[in-house]
């Protein structure tokens, strides 16, 4: 497995390095994307594909009286996320679990918001995963997707050649999948190659 395969599912020592790098490298696009999330101070938020936990930490700051849960299918990512958010976990404001977005262990209609930063590229069955997100969201809840790539450049295509199982979706494709899953009020925000999409249940 190449080092860059760790972007999909971090494993071993290389995976530990990768999640640390992603916490730093994805910071600018994540901060930009979070501007489009309107969440109450006491919101319940789920971060799918939580990686190294940096966005969980940002969400906890955005919702200081809320609860933030994270899910990732990489044990390395879960371990890192727990370390980064250890204080909030002890306080009962944060939970990080290992699992698949395609079959989540959460109750129906539980979250006020669900986020997915730099992760939908790797979801194996996007329609099914979007239906799962729809299931766990409350009516009126928001699903936010934030990506550094919108499939508009040759560089995007090169990444899909380097990293197995990676698909870079255009904003129009994501919008169509979201609407098929039942979402409405789909809004698309762009900044150069960056993409942020919000959708309502």
What does each model-found stretch correspond to?
Residues 102-113:
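A short acidic, Gly/Pro-enriched loop at the edge of an enzyme's catalytic core
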Residues 1-14:
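N-terminal, positively charged/glycine-rich alpha-helical extensions of SAM-dependent methyltransferases
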Residues 13-23, 142-198:
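C-terminal alpha-helical "lid/dimerization" subdomain adjacent to the S-adenosyl-L-methionine
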Residues 24-43, 58:
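Conserved alpha-helix/loop element of class I SAM-dependent methyltransferases that forms part
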Residues 44-103:
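Class I SAM-dependent methyltransferase SAM/SAH-binding core
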Residues 113-125:
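A short SAM/SAH-binding and catalytic strip from SAM-dependent methyltransferases
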Residues 127-139:
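A short glycine-rich, Lys/Arg-flanked "PGG" loop and its adjoining helix->strand segment in the class I
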Residues 42, 137-142:
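Short glycine-dipeptide loop
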